From Swiss-Prot:
Additional record remark: Heme 1 (or BL or b562) is low-potential and absorbs at about 562 nm, and heme 2 (or BH or b566) is high-potential and absorbs at about 566 nm.
Principal location listed in the UniProt entry: mitochondrion
The protein's name: Cytochrome b
Organism: Meleagris gallopavo
Disulfide bridge positions per record: none
Length: 380
C-alpha cells in the first residue's frame, strides 16, 4: 500500500501531527477554543496591519494625516483600520480568557507551556502599546510619554535608558519611527514564540476539565475539534464584525482624534481598556519606583503561579472554595479595570489601593492557603 503523503512528507507530517491526527482529550470544553482563536486573531492582525502599513507614514508631520487618508481615500481603508483596532481588543479578550482557563483548570502545571505563554502576553502588550502610538493623536503621544517615562524610575541608568528609547530628549520623530519598526517586527516574534508554545504543549498533550490524565481516552483533533474551533471562530467573529461595523470607536479614546500636541496635556491620560487593570495598580502606589515595580509584578506574578499550587487536585472543578476565590479575583480585576479609567480623586484612589492589595493577596496568599485547607478537609 502506498504511504499516505500526509503522514510521510517532512512538512505535511508536522502539520498532520499538530492539527489533524493530534490525540486530544475527548472531554475538553469550549474553554479550550481560545488557543485557536488567538491564532486567528494574530493572522488577522498581521494581514490587516500589513495592508495598513502600506499606506502609513512614520513621520510626526504626516502620521495623523496618513491614518485619516487611509480611512477616507483607500479602498476599504476604514474597514482595515477599524478591524485592526478592534481586533486588538478581541485579541486581549481571548488571551485573558485563555489565561483564566489556565488558572482555573491548573494548566499552569505544564510549566514550559505556561512560561512561554507569559512571554507571549508580555510581547503582545508591548506590541499593542507601540501600535497605539502610531496614529500620533493626543492620547498616542501622551500615553507614549507617560509609559516610557516610567523607565526613568530605574535607579542610576533610568534617565539614560529613557532618552535612549526616545532617541532624544522627548517623544518625537525618532520615537515614532522606532515604534513603527517595533510594531512591524513584534507580531512576527509572537508568531515564532507561538510555535514554541505549541511545541511545548504537544510534548505533554492538552489538560482537560477534570484535571486528570486523559491517556485512556483520546480522539483525533480533526474532525472533532477542527469543527468545534470553527464554531468558536464564528461566535467570535460575530461580535468583532458587529463592533467594527456599527460602533468602531466605542473602545477608543475621543482624545485620539486630535493630532498630538506636546504643549497641551489631555485632562485624563489613560491607556486602552486592556491595560487599565495594570494602570490602576501602577497609580495606586504613591511612589514612582514602587508603582513601576507593582506594575511589572501585576503581570510577572503569573510566573509564580505554578509554584503556589498547593492542592493535591489539579483543576478547580471539584474545589468550591478555590472556585469562589477565583471568581473573586475576576471581580477584583473588573474593579481594577474600572478604577483605571477614572480620574485620580477621592473615592477612586482608595478603591484602587484596596483592589490592588486584594489582587496580590488573593494570588500570593489566599490561593495556596485555600489549596492546603481543601487538602486537609478532604483528608488528602
Amino acid at each position: 500500500m502506498a504511504p499516505n503523503i500526509r503522514k510521510s512528507h517532512p512538512l505535511l507530517k508536522t502539520i498532520n501531527n499538530s492539527l489533524i491526527d493530534l490525540p486530544t482529550p475527548s472531554n475538553i470544553s469550549a474553554w479550550w477554543n481560545f488557543g485557536s482563536l488567538l491564532a486567528v486573531c494574530l493572522i488577522t492582525q498581521i494581514l490587516t496591519g500589513l495592508l495598513l502599513a502600506m499606506h502609513y507614514t512614520a513621520d510626526t508631520t504626516l502620521a495623523f494625516s496618513s491614518v485619516a487618508y487611509t480611512c477616507r481615500n483607500v479602498q476599504y481603508g476604514w474597514l482595515l483600520h477599524n478591524l485592526h483596532a478592534n481586533g486588538a481588543s478581541f485579541f486581549f479578550i481571548c488571551i485573558f480568557l485563555h489565561i483564566g482557563r489556565g488558572l482555573y483548570y491548573g494548566s499552569y502545571l505544564y510549566k514550559e507551556t505556561w512560561n512561554t505563554g507569559v512571554v507571549l502576553l508580555l510581547t503582545l502588550m508591548a506590541t499593542a502599546f507601540v501600535g497605539y502610538v502610531l496614529p500620533w493623536g493626543q492620547m498616542s503621544f501622551w500615553g507614549a510619554t507617560v509609559i516610557t517615562n516610567l523607565f526613568s524610575a530605574i535607579p542610576y541608568i533610568g534617565q539614560t535608558l529613557v532618552e535612549w528609547a526616545w532617541g532624544g530628549f522627548s517623544v518625537d520623530n525618532p520615537t515614532l519611527t522606532r515604534f513603527f519598526a517595533l510594531h512591524f517586527l513584534l507580531p512576527f516574534m509572537i508568531a515564532g514564540i507561538t510555535i514554541i508554545h505549541l511545541m511545548f504543549l504537544h510534548e505533554s498533550g492538552s489538560n482537560n476539565p477534570l484535571g486528570i490524565s486523559s491517556n485512556a481516552d483520546k480522539i483525533p483533533f480533526h474532525p472533532y475539534y477542527s469543527i468545534k474551533d470553527i464554531l468558536g471562530l464564528t461566535i467570535m467573529l460575530t461580535p468583532l464584525l458587529t463592533l467594527t461595523l456599527f460602533s468602531p470607536n466605542l473602545l477608543g479614546d475621543p482624545e485620539n482624534f486630535t493630532p498630538a500636541n506636546p504643549l497641551v496635556t489631555p485632562p485624563h491620560i489613560k491607556p486602552e481598556w486592556y491595560f487599565l487593570f495594570a494602570y490602576a495598580i501602577l497609580r495606586s502606589i504613591p511612589n514612582k519606583l514602587g508603582g513601576v515595580l507593582a506594575l511589572a509584578a501585576s503581570v510577572l506574578i503569573l510566573l509564580l503561579i505554578p509554584f503556589l499550587h498547593k492542592s493535591k487536585q489539579r483543576a478547580m472543578t471539584f474545589r468550591p472554595l478555590s472556585q469562589t476565590l477565583f471568581w473573586l479575583l475576576v471581580a477584583n480585576l473588573l474593579i481594577l479595570t474600572w478604577v483605571g479609567s477614572q480620574p485620580v480623586e477621592h473615592p477612586f484612589i482608595i478603591i484602587g489601593q484596596m483592589a490592588s492589595l486584594s489582587y496580590f493577596t488573593i494570588l500570593l496568599i489566599l490561593f495556596p492557603l485555600i489549596g492546603a485547607l481543601e487538602n486537609k478537609m478532604l483528608n488528602l
